[in-house]
Every structure is written in C-alpha cells, then in structure tokens.
UniProtKB/Swiss-Prot annotation:
InterPro entries found in the cross-reference section: Integrase-like_N, TACO1_YebC-like_2nd/3rd_dom, TACO1_YebC_N, Transcrip_reg_TACO1-like, Transcrip_reg_TACO1-like_dom3, YebC-like
A single BP term in Gene Ontology: regulation of DNA-templated transcription
Principal subcellular localization: cytoplasm
Highest classification ranks of the organism: Bacteria, Bacillati, Chloroflexota, Dehalococcoidia, Dehalococcoidales
The organism of origin for this protein: Dehalococcoides mccartyi (strain CBDB1)
Name this polypeptide is given: Probable transcriptional regulatory protein cbdbA400
SUPFAM superfamilies named among the record's database cross-references: YebC-like
Length: 251
C-alpha cells in the first residue's frame, strides 16, 4: 500500500469524546439495521452484519441494543427505512474526502454534508470525483502499551496483513477485506487484545499538508463525523503527529 492517512489512529485518540456525544450507539445500531435488512438477520450468513455486531461489541454496546437493531432490520420490530449513501468532496488544500452516510432522508443528509463542506473551506463534489483514490481495506486497531511492536508487526505480516502503521501507542493493521476476520482471530488466539476491526476506505496515495491547512482539514473531518447521518469519513491527508496533537489540545 502506498499510503494511509492515520485517521483510524486519530479517531482512536478522540474516541472517548465521540462516546460522550451520545451518537456512537445510534450509528452502530443504524449499521446493524441496514446490514440485517440487506443480508438477513443471521450473522453466520451475513458478513456485513457479523462485522457490524463485532464492532458494536468492541464499542461495548449492550447486547439488548444489538438484538433490537437486528430485529428492526429484519422487520421483526418496527423501524425506519435506512438508506446508505457515499458522498464525495474536497477539503482545504484540495484534500479528497469520502463520506459514508446512512439516514432515512437522503436530501437532508446531502444538505447537511454540503453545508459542512462549505463551512469548512471545502466543497461537495459529484459522484466519482474522488472515490477512485480510495479502496476498501480491513483496519485492525491494537493498543500497543506493553507490546513489542516490531514483533507484532512481523506477526501481522506473516498472517497476511498488507501493511502496518504504529503511532502514539496505537497500531493499525491493514488487510484485504476478506482476510480481516481471519487475521483478527489469529491475533486474538495469540493473546493480542483487539481494540477495533472494521472496513475502512483507505487512500491509495496521501498528500502532505502544511500546518494551517492540516488544522483546517482535521476540523472539517471532525465536524462531518459529528453529523447524525454520517457513519464514517475518510481522507487522503497524511497528518503530522505533532499537528494532530496540537489540534486536539486546542479542540
């Protein structure tokens, strides 16, 4: 892989704040509902649902909430119709941004995302404008305190991982989509505690930014993720760790 944005690491650093916003479980439920509706309520035969449930468990979502979301998706319980959409845009400095949204009202979501792009010094673009820059990859997150990161990196590569990034006490292990669950299980078998494992849109190449532009892009990505209808946000910006630390100290 020729580049990554370290956005998983950045999001990990602010994960506690996300939970305080009270949106986390709502977004996790939405993903489960959509997955169950698309592929059925059985995790064994529905890979997307299986991953959504595991992500919810990783985030300590109560099992009752998970079961209720599955039942809403399968139609056993009444729920709103959820649609998925991929919105594309440009941030400050021409950074490519990919927004994964889920909602019951596409027009509202598009309007909210467009407004946030405009407010953050960017612009919403047409479909296909930047999606070609990204590819879907499995990203496994591991807290590395007390671990030999060199040894863990080699283990992950031996298990079939494509790339590894270690930064600020956190490791991202990048895999091909079909290999993520297998590699996660192998790591857990060897006693590695997994913090998160999800499918992310990872940039094929990244762009370096000056500090001022990087701060603007970080703010835009944060504001987009804070929108109720936005599930995930990806960009092709390569953020300097010192700039990220400065941004969070001012946030």
């Amino acid at each position: 892989m020729s580049g990554h944005s370290k956005w998983a690491t950045i999001k990990h650093a602010k994960g506690a704040a996300d939970a305080k916003r009270g949106q986390l479980f709502t977004k996790l439920s939405r993903e489960i509902i959509f997955a169950a509706k698309q592929g059925g309520p059985s995790p064994e035969g529905n890979a997307r649902l299986r991953l959504a449930i595991q992500k919810a468990k990783d985030s300590r979502m109560p099992s009752d909430n998970i079961e209720r979301a599955i039942k809403k998706g399968s139609g056993e319980l009444e729920g709103t119709t959820v649609i998925e959409m991929i919105l594309e845009g440009y941030g400050p400095g021409g950074v490519a941004v990919l927004v994964n949204g889920m909602s019951d009202n596409r027009n509202r979501t598009v309007s909210d995302v467009r407004h946030m792009f405009s407010k953050g010094g960017g612009s919403l673009a047409e479909s296909g404008a930047v999606s070609w820059i990204f590819e879907a990859k499995g990203v496994i997150g591991v807290e590395t305190a007390g671990l030999d990161t060199d040894e863990l990196s080699l283990k992950a590569i031996d298990m079939g991982a494509e790339d590894v990034n270690t930064d600020e006490g956190y490791m991202e292990i990048y895999t091909a989509m079909p290999d993520m669950e297998k590699i996660r299980q192998q790591l857990e078998t060897q006693g590695v505690t997994i913090d998160s494992a999800e499918i992310n849109m990872v940039p094929k190449n990244t762009v370096k930014l000056d500090e001022e532009t990087a701060m603007q892009v970080l703010k835009l990505l944060d504001k987009l993720e804070e929108l109720d209808d936005v599930q995930t946000v990806s960009s092709n910006a390569d953020f300097d760790p010192e700039v990220v630390e400065k941004y969070h100290s001012q946030a």
